[in-house]
Amino acid sequence: MLLKFMYIYGIGCGLMPAPLKKGQFLLGYKQRWYLIYTACLHGGLLTVLPFTFPHYMYDDSYMSSNPVLKWTFNLTNITRIMAMFSGVLLMWFRRKRILNLGENLILHCLKCKTLDNRSKKYSKLRKRVRNVLFQMLLVANLSILLGALILFRIHSVQRISKTAMIVAHITQFIYVVFMMTGICVILLVLHWQSERLQIALKDLCSFLNHEERNSLTLSENKANRSLGKLAKLFKLFAENQRLVREVFRTFDLPIALLLLKMFVTNVNLVYHGVQFGNDTIETSSYTRIVGQWVVISHYWSAVLLMNVVDDVTRRSDLKMGDLLREFSHLELVKRDFHLQLELFSDHLRCHPSTYKVCGLFIFNKQTSLAYFFYVLVQVLVLVQFDLKNKVEKRN
């Protein structure tokens, strides 16, 4: 049900390469109508673009006397527009590639679904995935709602200009938020399949350990079944890794610009928080509460992104490596099984799942924490710059 909601949001925002029906992308006549709708939607986003930077925000708002607030406002808008354009261009120039990726992802999910035997382990996994997916959709909707409430609280006598600015910002915000949520959902689905593979590998290890304790030899039938299952799991794991790499390659530029947008928004939010805390900006208790929830939703979204990327890269490899080591003590299995196990281990060792953003830096939990620390440093620099301006004005 939650995946259906995400699909509806993706179709509504023009973020799908084509509509889906019974697990297959619709092409031809029906796709043509969807392309027309997407073109109109993207045309609308371009039409409202000039209203993103209204004059009254610089001359007749709370930031009119603070150059740092104007600078962060401009930078936040520019990075959001850049992220939005990266998504728009991706949908038009790489549509076939995204279609192929979507078809391969659906096929991979169907293969991994055959491993799910409705046992307690798989039920717990489904609940865990459902919980994360619910959080992603909740945070996306909450971020849009809170962003709209904050925009409505900005006072201005120019009502038409203010309304146009709110429409421009909300439409851009909806597009960017669901673009990031869509990428997170794709990675979450791949992580779900990886977890299914790990459960199946654990079950195979438990079965062989049971045979090791209770039998002197492993029958030909059981040996062949075990070897076949290990080979199947290895093939599915390699396919899962390939799809993860393909997702990162396809969405590399949008992810990089979304991370840049998150960084700038982070600086903007923390700096606003400092200004509100010092009572430099006049505000009501209602605006203060909404602002606090904006900060919470932003960091919640950042943590979800950080966790899902870490799950499909570093953590997935560590878990799989630990599971493969549990097979090392088995003695009843045949030489072919050990060779297949060695092949699995070599593949894992030679193809580590890491994500380099545009080939510049590895994105994982460690770099994310360093990024949060760097934001605080940047805000301290901005506060010092702000204090320097105040001293110069007094003199």
Curated annotation (Swiss-Prot):
Coiled coil: none annotated. Glycans are attached at residue 278. One of its GO terms (molecular function) is ligand-gated monoatomic ion channel activity. One of its GO terms (biological process) is signal transduction. Residues 1-32, 94-131, 191-250, 310-366 are cytoplasmic. GO terms for cellular component: axon; dendrite; membrane; neuronal cell body; plasma membrane. Belongs to the insect chemoreceptor superfamily. Gustatory receptor (GR) family. Gr22e subfamily. This is Putative gustatory receptor 58a.
